[in-house]
């Protein structure tokens, strides 16, 4: 009987290892699928990508030639500041006058000394490589907290963009510095450290003014969270930091400093435009065109604020009240509300910019995966989203820009805007109780 039992059990024992291996392989394949699709794996995928980016970034530095564009001009402007020139109208570089706020000078003064008065280009590239990796970490922390974007998208946000690697480590522009500080401020907002976040936001503005495109969204969030009176101290922090940083130059020539560093009417050269190549140059330079873009920008911001960001049922003027005195009980801002409003505010500004130059790509590159994937839309499949992302990348990599590349960029922007407009409400009815903020 025992022999019979062993005989009858033998086929099962022989087939058992094969069955185990089959189950293990099936589970491994399933987990790999989930690894790329489930946002809960963001940190794991992000860690692997950051490790890969260390090699890729330093490979780019050593294999691709550095291109001088603005670095020498930055260093010349910094040297003038170090030599005691505090009149902004007298600070010049090879490419023209200094047009950035004071924070730029202080940060690049540190780079001036770290790179042997700006002459050690490899050292500067290594510093910007570290800045690139830090920026990635800050961005991944944002995506981890929102838990909306499938991790497979991050491959396209990291390794696939030659233009972004070039902006950071082959061109050494100041735009990456401003954006790194901006992403740090968003992480602070997500941690409910609103005062420190506003301080860091203002510091980012002091490096380059493009960060102000996030300001309408930030103002809306501050009013939502604190009301008018509660938001005033946060806004005062932003203003005070600008005054402190610019004080040496304001004392020397206040009009010169303000007109140079915060010149909102500065004219752009048509030869560098990425987004308006299909227009005649006369229209591109015309003041009426600029005013029309500004009107469209402000109108769309107002529409989003009224119809998409503010959906509590109260008048938008209720945001001016103390949160405890509103009809709708005060609610904590969720990570997705904070990020979606800030990213959307910036994206609307990008869409209606008077001109986008190649280095401006970093103004919104790292926000595109969120804008495309975080807002559910049945009509926009993963494949279509990747197509939009790819066309945007192609448009920014077309040099010089063409009428087709500019038109394709606007078409992609329109698709993203449409998805944002059709997305579900940013402020759902059921939100966790408000937490203590500071």
Swiss-Prot record:
<dbReference type="GO" id="GO:0005789">
    <property type="term" value="C:endoplasmic reticulum membrane"/>
</dbReference>
<keyword id="KW-1133">Transmembrane helix</keyword>
<comment type="function">
    <text>Dol-P-Man:Man(5)GlcNAc(2)-PP-Dol alpha-1,3-mannosyltransferase that operates in the biosynthetic pathway of dolichol-linked oligosaccharides, the glycan precursors employed in protein asparagine (N)-glycosylation. The assembly of dolichol-linked oligosaccharides begins on the cytosolic side of the endoplasmic reticulum membrane and finishes in its lumen. The sequential addition of sugars to dolichol pyrophosphate produces dolichol-linked oligosaccharides containing fourteen sugars, including two GlcNAcs, nine mannoses and three glucoses.</text>
</comment>
<feature type="transmembrane region" description="Helical">
    <location>
        <begin position="231"/>
        <end position="251"/>
    </location>
</feature>
<dbReference type="Pfam" id="PF05208">
    <property type="entry name" value="ALG3"/>
</dbReference>
<feature type="transmembrane region" description="Helical">
    <location>
        <begin position="123"/>
        <end position="143"/>
    </location>
</feature>
<keyword id="KW-0472">Membrane</keyword>
<keyword id="KW-0256">Endoplasmic reticulum</keyword>
<feature type="transmembrane region" description="Helical">
    <location>
        <begin position="149"/>
        <end position="169"/>
    </location>
</feature>
<comment type="pathway">
    <text>Protein modification; protein glycosylation.</text>
</comment>
<feature type="transmembrane region" description="Helical">
    <location>
        <begin position="289"/>
        <end position="309"/>
    </location>
</feature>
<dbReference type="GO" id="GO:0006488">
    <property type="term" value="P:dolichol-linked oligosaccharide biosynthetic process"/>
</dbReference>
<dbReference type="GO" id="GO:0006487">
    <property type="term" value="P:protein N-linked glycosylation"/>
</dbReference>
<keyword id="KW-0808">Transferase</keyword>
<feature type="modified residue" description="Phosphoserine">
    <location>
        <position position="13"/>
    </location>
</feature>
<dbReference type="InterPro" id="IPR007873">
    <property type="entry name" value="Glycosyltransferase_ALG3"/>
</dbReference>
<feature type="transmembrane region" description="Helical">
    <location>
        <begin position="203"/>
        <end position="223"/>
    </location>
</feature>
<feature type="transmembrane region" description="Helical">
    <location>
        <begin position="95"/>
        <end position="115"/>
    </location>
</feature>
<protein>
    <recommendedName>
        <fullName>Dol-P-Man:Man(5)GlcNAc(2)-PP-Dol alpha-1,3-mannosyltransferase</fullName>
        <ecNumber>2.4.1.258</ecNumber>
    </recommendedName>
</protein>
<feature type="transmembrane region" description="Helical">
    <location>
        <begin position="407"/>
        <end position="427"/>
    </location>
</feature>
<feature type="transmembrane region" description="Helical">
    <location>
        <begin position="356"/>
        <end position="376"/>
    </location>
</feature>
<dbReference type="GO" id="GO:0052925">
    <property type="term" value="F:dol-P-Man:Man(5)GlcNAc(2)-PP-Dol alpha-1,3-mannosyltransferase activity"/>
</dbReference>
<feature type="transmembrane region" description="Helical">
    <location>
        <begin position="172"/>
        <end position="192"/>
    </location>
</feature>
<keyword id="KW-0597">Phosphoprotein</keyword>
<keyword id="KW-0812">Transmembrane</keyword>
<keyword id="KW-0328">Glycosyltransferase</keyword>
<feature type="transmembrane region" description="Helical">
    <location>
        <begin position="41"/>
        <end position="61"/>
    </location>
</feature>
<comment type="similarity">
    <text>Belongs to the glycosyltransferase ALG3 family.</text>
</comment>
<feature type="transmembrane region" description="Helical">
    <location>
        <begin position="332"/>
        <end position="352"/>
    </location>
</feature>
């Amino acid at each position: 009987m025992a022999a019979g039992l062993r005989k009858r059990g033998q086929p099962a024992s022989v087939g058992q290892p094969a069955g185990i291996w089959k189950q293990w392989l099936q589970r491994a394949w399933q987990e790999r699928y989930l690894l790329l699709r489930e946002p809960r794996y963001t940190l794991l995928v992000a860690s692997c990508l950051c490790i890969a980016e260390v090699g890729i970034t330093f490979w780019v530095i050593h294999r691709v030639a550095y291109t001088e564009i603005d670095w020498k001009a930055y260093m010349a402007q910094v040297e003038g500041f170090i030599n005691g020139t505090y009149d902004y109208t007298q600070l010049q570089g090879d490419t023209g006058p200094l047009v950035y706020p004071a924070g730029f000078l202080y940060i690049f003064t540190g780079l001036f000394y770290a790179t042997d008065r700006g002459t050690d280009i490899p050292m500067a590239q290594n510093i910007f490589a570290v800045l690139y990796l830090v920026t990635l970490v800050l961005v991944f922390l944002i995506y981890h907290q929102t838990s909306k974007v499938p991790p497979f998208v991050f491959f396209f946000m990291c390794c696939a963009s030659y233009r972004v690697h070039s902006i950071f480590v082959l061109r050494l522009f100041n735009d990456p510095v401003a954006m790194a500080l901006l992403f740090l401020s968003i992480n602070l907002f997500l941690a409910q450290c609103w005062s420190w976040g506003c301080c860091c936001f203002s510091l980012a503005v002091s490096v380059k003014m493009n960060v102000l495109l996030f300001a309408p969204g930030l103002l809306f969030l501050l009013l939502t969270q604190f009301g008018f009176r509660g938001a005033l101290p946060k806004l005062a922090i932003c203003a005070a930091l600008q005054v402190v940083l610019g004080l040496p130059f304001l004392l020397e020539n206040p009009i010169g400093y303000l007109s140079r560093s915060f010149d909102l009417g500065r004219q752009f050269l048509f030869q560098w435009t990425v987004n308006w190549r299909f227009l005649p140059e006369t229209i591109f330079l015309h003041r009426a065109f600029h005013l029309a873009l500004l009107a469209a920008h402000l109108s769309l911001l107002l529409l989003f604020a009224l119809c998409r960001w503010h959906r509590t049922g109260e008048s938008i003027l209720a945001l001016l009240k103390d949160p405890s005195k509103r009809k709708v009980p005060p609610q904590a801002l969720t990570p997705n509300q904070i990020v979606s409003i800030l990213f959307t505010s910036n994206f609307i500004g990008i869409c209606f910019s008077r001109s986008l130059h190649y280095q401006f790509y970093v103004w919104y590159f790292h926000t595109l995966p969120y804008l495309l994937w975080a807002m559910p839309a049945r009509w926009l499949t993963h494949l279509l989203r990747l197509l939009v992302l790819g066309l945007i990348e192609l448009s920014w990599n077309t040099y010089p820009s063409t009428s087709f590349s500019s038109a394709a960029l606007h078409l992609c922007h329109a698709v993203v805007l449409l998805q944002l407009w059709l997305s579900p409400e940013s402020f759902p009815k059921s939100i966790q109780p408000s937490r203590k903020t500071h």
